[in-house]
Amino acid sequence: MDESILEGLSSVKGYLGGAINNYTGECLVCDAAKLSGNLEATSATFNDIFRDSHAVSKNLKLGATEIMEIHTEKAVILMGCSGEESRVHLHAFAVFNSDGNVALGKMALKKLLPQAVEALA
């Protein structure tokens, strides 16, 4: 899998970077051209947070977490899951600046995950 799979996300207004990780946190593809810092390492930490949210929501009998949104002073981080029962369990991450089009980002993230699963299945 290469960075071209992130094109749908990268075309959204305000996109700063994105990554796709397997369930264990290994970064499979990463685009951090507009971000400072190490997105590959950071996405592994976000992966842990997302896995914890899976456990918490399942503990409450709500099912696995599908999408998560974190707002910071300068950005919005979206995290999405391909589904625990999908052929390949993936987590995708996207970072947008605070005035980016987060609604379109969510749609692009939901569209990207099945494509990534198909590419790896």
Range-by-range predicted roles:
Residues M1-G17, N22-Y23, C27-A121:
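Non-catalytic interaction/Regulatory regions outside core domains
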